[in-house]
Regions:
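Conserved hydrolase catalytic core segment
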Residues: 2-49
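Alpha/beta-hydrolase
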Residues: 67-158
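Active-site loop signature of alpha/beta-hydrolase-fold enzymes
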Residues: 42, 161, 190
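Catalytic histidine-centered segment of alpha/beta-hydrolase-like enzymes
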Residues: 184-200
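Short aromatic-enriched loop/helix-cap "lid" or pocket-rim segments at secondary-structure transitions
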Residues: 45-50, 165-167, 195-196
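Short, flexible helix-coil linker/hinge segments at the edges of structured domains or between repeats
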Residues: 39-67
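C-terminal alpha-helix
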Residues: 202-210
Length: 212
């Protein structure tokens, strides 16, 4: 094996960061760097506010879980599922082939008394539980377990998540002397699905910067 790059989008970025902090010698070979894709790191008063929302069970009213728990999960067929998502604001900007892949691998046919229908391949309750348990303690975790690998960040130019969370802690992690480690791609929080080719190119540039 070889040292690994950890690359994650949204929650995947947070998990990559947590893994790098807690397990710097991952697999016995170490971690070369962490690349966050629109995963602005929460710290300060915003982190404490999220912690309070989780403690008081109010997090479900402010997290994406308020949408996922009511997400439609069945359609007559795959084309109907595609058409449904294609007209949803969050999915309408996706590259069509990416959305087709989402339907192909994120849904499946289910046999029912009337024949077959297309259903989600994941449970809404699990998705909602994930949203409602977003980490609020990253700042404290990183103080206890300082990162031993460099960090880079790629964000969407129209990302609401970046605006809501702020970028102060992310800037501290990336550092001021590495402009190649803070990149932007046109699009929303879901820019990897909206502009996959541009995202792949940005990932390559960011990893090259981390390797220097």
């Amino acid at each position: 094996g070889q040292p690994a790059w950890l690359v994650g989008h949204s929650l995947g970025g947070f998990l990559s960061l947590m893994c790098a902090a807690r397990h710097p010698a991952l697999g016995g070979h170490g971690i070369k760097g962490v690349l966050l894709l629109d995963s602005p790191v929460l710290g300060g008063w915003r982190a404490r506010a999220l912690e309070l929302a989780k403690r008081t069970q109010l997090v479900g009213s402010i997290s994406p879980g308020k949408i996922s728990r009511k997400r439609r999960n069945a359609w007559p067929d795959a084309q109907a599922a595609f058409d449904h998502f294609a007209h949803k604001k969050a999915f309408a900007r996706w590259e069509p082939q990416v959305l087709r892949d989402y339907i192909a691998h994120g849904t499946h046919d289910e046999t029912i008394a009337q024949g077959t229908r297309r259903v989600l391949s994941f449970e809404r309750d699990v998705e909602t539980a994930i949203y409602n348990t977003l980490p609020h303690n990253l700042d404290r975790l990183l103080r206890r377990h300082p990162l031993q690998a460099p960090v880079a960040f790629i964000g969407g130019t129209e990302s609401q998540e970046m605006k809501q969370v702020g970028m102060a802690m992310t800037h501290r992690l990336v550092g001021k002397n590495h402009p190649g480690r803070l990149l932007m791609v046109e699009g929303s929080h879901l820019f990897p699905m909206e502009r996959p080719q541009e995202t792949a190119a940005a990932i390559e540039r960011a990893l090259q910067s981390l390797a220097r």
